[in-house]
Amino acid sequence: ADNRRPIWNLGHMVNALKQIPTFLXDGANA
């Protein structure tokens, strides 16, 4: 389980980083 958590965390962070520019763009458009 300990070996899987870091990998999942990295994947989650990558997904979050991909979503951040979208939120910034939506905020700028609003």
Swiss-Prot record:
InterPro entries, sorted: PLC-like_Pdiesterase_TIM-brl (IPR017946)
Gene3D superfamilies: Phosphatidylinositol (PI) phosphodiesterase
Domain of life of the native organism: Eukaryota
Enzyme Commission code(s) on record: 4.6.1.-
GO molecular function per UniProt: lyase activity; metal ion binding; phosphoric diester hydrolase activity; toxin activity
Post-translational modification: Contains 1 disulfide bond.
Catalytic residues in the record: H12
Reaction equation(s) it catalyzes: an N-(acyl)-sphingosylphosphocholine = an N-(acyl)-sphingosyl-1,3-cyclic phosphate + choline; an N-(acyl)-sphingosylphosphoethanolamine = an N-(acyl)-sphingosyl-1,3-cyclic phosphate + ethanolamine; a 1-acyl-sn-glycero-3-phosphocholine = a 1-acyl-sn-glycero-2,3-cyclic phosphate + choline; a 1-acyl-sn-glycero-3-phosphoethanolamine = a 1-acyl-sn-glycero-2,3-cyclic phosphate + ethanolamine
Cofactor note: Binds 1 Mg(2+) ion per subunit.
Location in or out of the cell: Secreted
Transmembrane segments: none
Enzyme class: lyase
The protein's required cofactors: Mg(2+)
Family listed: Belongs to the arthropod phospholipase D family. Class I subfamily.
Name the UniProt record assigns to this protein: Dermonecrotic toxin LlSicTox-alphaIII-1
